[in-house]
């Protein structure tokens, strides 16, 4: 048996004769700058493509007044070779969209675009007209009261829409407001695809809610009595069919307590609602939640945990009982056998040791819990599987594995290392809001 046939039978994929795998520059950029900040430059990563694939560069600039959105995709492609091409999809006056595309196979790293100069053509100031329009480019949403600009001469209508960009490592929603020379929802001027990036346009205002966004995990001794801040400065735009949500879960074991909260867009199909639920009541461990789904911009605006605490019945000072139990809440770890012990209140005659797994709303964590309960078979969530945006699962007397955020591990395309020194990394901050989660 030949060596080639043997390798094929063992599952090895052999390149076709004459077809060589290329190395390509690789990465994505999605950002909004001031027009005066252009041109920009970047440092791409490298990637090895499958045999037969080429390298591609796709760059687009969307300009509205003093702002410009830059979208860049670099990587491998199945598309046929194409010479560098600059396309003016829509030029002013007012909003404009221009792109650069290139596909090559002649050598490694032939997609070597490292700056926005091919699309950089400073324009002289336009003569002002009589129309004023809100001007905004944002991946987080344009808020009411956005600054209005005097539109250039030749524009007659204000544009307000949402561009959805999908493909080539790009997955984003761009809210666009600005000046246009005609009415209607036609910023793209018929364009449906630029390079590997598919584009759709929507001007139905009800289809793109803007919601507050952020997660928080806080552990303290008196969170069940004293309200704490629950605000975030970040926002996000929702997909069609989503509404805004805010979910807050309180766990109080006596000596310590934990709040877990999230704000953002809901799952598709959620209905408007607001409620407070006591899942486990004293004597012993208290577990309660506040959930709110709503369908107007920034309606998930509760500013403190008082929205939950004010709905809880007042608790008298507990009368000590005869049982002692370890007490602990570890939202990002495991309670140990050496947890502090406390005398349980009268009526709480058993010790609880288990964990609750929460996932959803940008958060995934297993919380280890120890405390006093009234019944030996008590489940703190009373078999509840959904708390607002959170999917919940409870187990007793099991050591949970290590916690991690949703989406942990390798993501899709790597982002670029900026030559201008801009870098952002999501993080979960202990005891404070994590807006980027």
From Swiss-Prot:
Conditions for induction: By CSF3/G-CSF in resting granulocytes. Induced during CSF3/G-CSF-mediated neutrophil differentiation. Induced during pregnancy. Induced in patients with polycythemia vera (PV) and with essential thrombocythemia (ET).
A single GO molecular function term of this UniProt record: calcium-dependent protein binding
Mode of membrane association: Lipid-anchor; GPI-anchor; GPI-like-anchor
Domain of life according to the entry: Eukaryota
Keywords on record: Cell adhesion, Cell membrane, Cell projection, Glycoprotein, GPI-anchor, Immunity, Innate immunity, Lipoprotein, Membrane, Repeat, Secreted, Signal
Record-annotated UPAR/Ly6 domain positions: 133-210, 325-377
Function: In association with beta-2 integrin heterodimer ITGAM/CD11b and ITGB2/CD18, mediates activation of TNF-alpha primed neutrophils including degranulation and superoxide production. In addition, by preventing beta-2 integrin internalization and attenuating chemokine signaling favors adhesion over migration. Heterophilic interaction with PECAM1 on endothelial cells plays a role in neutrophil transendothelial migration in vitro. However, appears to be dispensable for neutrophil recruitment caused by bacterial infection in vivo.
GO annotation terms (biological process): cell adhesion; cell-cell adhesion via plasma-membrane adhesion molecules; cell-cell junction maintenance; innate immune response; leukocyte cell-cell adhesion; neutrophil extravasation; neutrophil migration; positive regulation of neutrophil degranulation
Subcellular location: Cell membrane; Membrane raft; Secreted; Cytoplasmic granule membrane
Propeptide residues, chain positions: 409-437
An example Gene Ontology CC term for this record: lamellipodium
Post-translational modification: N-glycosylated. A soluble form may also be produced by proteolytic cleavage at the cell surface (shedding).
Quaternary structure annotation from Swiss-Prot or TrEMBL: Found in a complex with integrin ITGAM/CD11b and ITGB2/CD18. Interacts with PECAM1 (via Ig-like C2-type domain 6); the interaction is Ca(2+)-dependent; the interaction is direct. Interacts with serine protease PRTN3/myeloblastin; the interaction tethers PRTN3 to the cell surface; the interaction is direct.
Residues bearing glycans: 189
Lipid anchor positions (GPI-anchor amidated glycine): 408
Gene field: CD177
Lineage, highest ranks first: Eukaryota, Metazoa, Chordata, Craniata, Vertebrata
A Pfam family hit: UPAR_LY6
Name of the protein in its database record: CD177 antigen
Organism whose genome encodes this protein: Homo sapiens
Tissue expression profile of the protein: Highly expressed in normal bone marrow and weakly expressed in fetal liver. During neutrophil differentiation, expression begins at the metamyelocyte stage and continues throughout the subsequent stages (at protein level). Expressed by a subset of mature neutrophils (at protein level). The percentage of neutrophils expressing CD177 varies across the population. Expressed in granulocytes of patients with polycythemia vera (PV) and with essential thrombocythemia (ET).
Signal peptide: 1-21
Main subcellular location: membrane
